[in-house]
Protein backbone atom coordinates (compact mmCIF):
# COMPACT_ATOMS: atom_id res chain seq x y z
CA UNK A 1 0.00 0.00 0.00
CA UNK A 2 1.33 3.43 -0.91
CA UNK A 3 -0.18 6.14 1.26
CA UNK A 4 -0.97 9.36 -0.55
CA UNK A 5 0.05 12.59 1.21
CA UNK A 6 -2.79 13.56 3.55
CA UNK A 7 -1.81 17.14 4.43
CA UNK A 8 0.37 18.31 1.53
CA UNK A 9 -0.12 22.03 1.02
CA UNK A 10 -1.22 22.55 4.63
CA UNK A 11 1.54 21.23 6.91
CA UNK A 12 4.26 21.26 4.25
CA UNK A 13 4.49 22.40 0.60
CA UNK A 14 2.53 20.31 -1.92
CA UNK A 15 5.09 21.01 -4.64
CA UNK A 16 7.97 18.48 -4.41
CA UNK A 17 10.63 21.07 -5.34
CA UNK A 18 9.36 23.53 -2.72
CA UNK A 19 9.25 20.73 -0.14
CA UNK A 20 12.85 19.69 -0.91
CA UNK A 21 13.99 23.32 -0.64
CA UNK A 22 12.22 23.78 2.69
CA UNK A 23 13.73 20.58 4.13
CA UNK A 24 17.22 21.59 2.96
CA UNK A 25 16.70 25.02 4.56
CA UNK A 26 15.58 23.48 7.87
CA UNK A 27 18.58 21.13 7.90
CA UNK A 28 20.89 24.01 6.99
CA UNK A 29 19.66 26.17 9.88
CA UNK A 30 20.79 23.58 12.42
CA UNK A 31 24.00 24.32 14.30
CA UNK A 32 26.88 22.28 12.92
CA UNK A 33 27.95 19.79 15.58
CA UNK A 34 29.64 16.39 15.51
CA UNK A 35 27.34 13.61 14.34
CA UNK A 36 25.96 11.27 17.00
CA UNK A 37 25.40 7.54 16.71
CA UNK A 38 22.03 7.11 18.43
CA UNK A 39 19.95 4.01 19.01
CA UNK A 40 16.78 6.08 18.81
CA UNK A 41 15.35 9.57 18.88
CA UNK A 42 12.05 11.37 19.36
CA UNK A 43 11.19 13.97 16.73
CA UNK A 44 8.06 16.13 16.51
CA UNK A 45 5.96 15.78 13.38
CA UNK A 46 3.67 18.81 13.37
CA UNK A 47 3.53 21.22 10.45
CA UNK A 48 7.04 22.20 9.36
CA UNK A 49 6.41 25.86 10.22
CA UNK A 50 5.72 24.80 13.83
CA UNK A 51 8.30 22.11 14.51
CA UNK A 52 10.47 21.80 11.41
CA UNK A 53 13.39 23.61 13.03
CA UNK A 54 13.43 21.05 15.86
CA UNK A 55 13.19 18.06 13.51
CA UNK A 56 15.90 19.60 11.30
CA UNK A 57 18.21 20.03 14.29
CA UNK A 58 17.67 16.41 15.37
CA UNK A 59 18.22 14.88 11.92
CA UNK A 60 21.21 17.13 11.22
CA UNK A 61 22.85 15.87 14.42
CA UNK A 62 22.32 12.14 13.77
CA UNK A 63 24.50 9.75 11.84
CA UNK A 64 21.70 7.99 9.95
CA UNK A 65 22.12 4.24 9.40
CA UNK A 66 21.29 2.50 6.12
CA UNK A 67 18.15 1.01 7.68
CA UNK A 68 15.90 2.44 10.36
CA UNK A 69 12.42 2.01 11.80
CA UNK A 70 9.92 4.85 12.03
CA UNK A 71 7.30 4.55 14.77
CA UNK A 72 4.45 7.02 14.80
CA UNK A 73 1.10 7.42 16.54
CA UNK A 74 -2.33 7.22 15.00
CA UNK A 75 -4.22 10.47 14.76
CA UNK A 76 -7.60 8.78 14.55
CA UNK A 77 -9.35 6.14 16.62
CA UNK A 78 -10.15 3.98 13.56
CA UNK A 79 -7.73 1.31 12.41
CA UNK A 80 -5.43 -1.19 14.00
CA UNK A 81 -3.54 -0.43 17.21
CA UNK A 82 -0.32 -1.46 15.45
CA UNK A 83 0.40 -1.57 11.72
CA UNK A 84 3.42 -2.21 9.53
CA UNK A 85 3.79 -0.36 6.24
CA UNK A 86 5.27 -2.19 3.28
Question: Model-found features: residue ranges?
Answer:
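Active-site histidine-anchored catalytic micro-motif
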Residues: 1-86
Amino acid sequence: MIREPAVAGRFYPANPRELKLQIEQLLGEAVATPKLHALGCVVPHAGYKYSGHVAGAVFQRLELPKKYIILCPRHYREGQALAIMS
